[in-house]
Amino acid sequence: MTPACEARLDAGLAELGLEVDATARERLLALLALLHKWNRAYNLTAVRDPEQMVTRHLLDSASVATAVRGPRLLDVGAGAGLPGLVLAILDPSLEVTMLDGNGKKVRFQRQAVLELGLENVTPVQARVEHFTTRDFDQIVSRAFAQLATFVELTRPLLAEGGEWLAMKGRDAASELAELPPDVTLIERRDLEVPGDAAQRVLLRLRRA
């Protein structure tokens, strides 16, 4: 990757207040290179420019890292492995399962796990309603579904006392209003992604 990509990544991580060791930094840059390479053939993301990938994929995913405690994390609708791969790189103690029904995207996830040597990540190709592994401490979604749908489809997979982490636009009030009465919002956190003017929030939810 170019020096400009490296500089953008380093500055963005510092702005997010994340301390990243050399191994994690190398893996993030390797993930970026792999995503850029595969995207030319497999159209994994609409973002083509590597510098924009740093902002809109790596830093956007990293922006929720301080809310992730795990240890068992499920990334639903993971697509090209975002945010799951980034979170697994930043915190090797996490046990990350990435779930997506799109075969080419899961193949990319598996290749990334192999090439980056990530022993704490398990990619799974399946629809969420057919997935039966349970007791995840946290379930994260970056661009999966409406909030109420996300909660209802993944409810059986969440451990007692577990949390949902939903990355949404800041106009999420209508989606919050449609949540079932036994689900409560415990935190609404504005996401300030370095270099990205998009208005985003992280919603932390729990069973009431």
Swiss-Prot record:
It comes from Chromohalobacter salexigens (strain ATCC BAA-138 / DSM 3043 / CIP 106854 / NCIMB 13768 / 1H11). The keyword Transferase applies. The lineage of its organism: Bacteria, Pseudomonadati, Pseudomonadota, Gammaproteobacteria, Oceanospirillales. S-adenosyl-L-methionine binds at residues 77, 82, 128-129, 142. Its main location: cytoplasm. HAMAP family: 16SrRNA_methyltr_G (MF_00074). GO terms for cellular component: cytosol. It catalyses: guanosine(527) in 16S rRNA + S-adenosyl-L-methionine = N(7)-methylguanosine(527) in 16S rRNA + S-adenosyl-L-homocysteine. Coiled coil: none annotated. It is found in: Cytoplasm. Keywords: Cytoplasm, Methyltransferase, rRNA processing, S-adenosyl-L-methionine, Transferase. This is Ribosomal RNA small subunit methyltransferase G. The keyword Transferase applies. One of its GO terms (molecular function) is rRNA (guanine-N7-)-methyltransferase activity. Belongs to the methyltransferase superfamily. RNA methyltransferase RsmG family. Signal peptide: none annotated. It is an enzyme of class 2 (transferase). Its EC number is 2.1.1.170. Specifically methylates the N7 position of guanine in position 527 of 16S rRNA. It comes from the Bacteria.
